[in-house]
């Protein structure tokens, strides 16, 4: 669930998972997907097909000087109405929300 995804990402961020701190830092570095504009986005995408639906995820956190913001976006699409932009809209929708909340500016 999205809640479980955010809880997991928070544990990774706080380095409270049952792995070495070094390995958790490596994972966080690999998850760095955008840097600049006064913030970093650390994230991971996912996509599966289940019961006639495409299910797309974008999970991670935005790190700014004044704090961090965690997110999990899950989109469902009926496979009978495939849209070419389904893969990119996970990120686009999430970024628009954070922009409207004045958390990011790009």
Regions found by a protein language model. Give the residues of each.
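Structured C-terminal helix/loop/strand segments within mature extracytoplasmic catalytic/sensor domains
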Residues: 6-106
């Amino acid at each position: 669930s999205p809640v479980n995804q955010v809880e997991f990402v928070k544990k990774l961020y706080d380095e409270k998972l049952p792995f070495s701190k070094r390995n958790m830092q490596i994972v966080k570095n690999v998850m760095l997907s955008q840097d600049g504009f006064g913030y970093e986005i650390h994230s991971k995408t996912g996509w599966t097909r289940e019961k006639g639906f495409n299910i797309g995820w974008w999970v991670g956190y935005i790190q700014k000087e004044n704090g961090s913001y965690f997110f999990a976006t899950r989109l469902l699409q009926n496979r009978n109405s495939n849209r070419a932009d389904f893969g990119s809209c996970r990120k686009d929708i999430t970024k628009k929300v954070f922009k409207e909340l004045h958390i990011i500016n790009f």
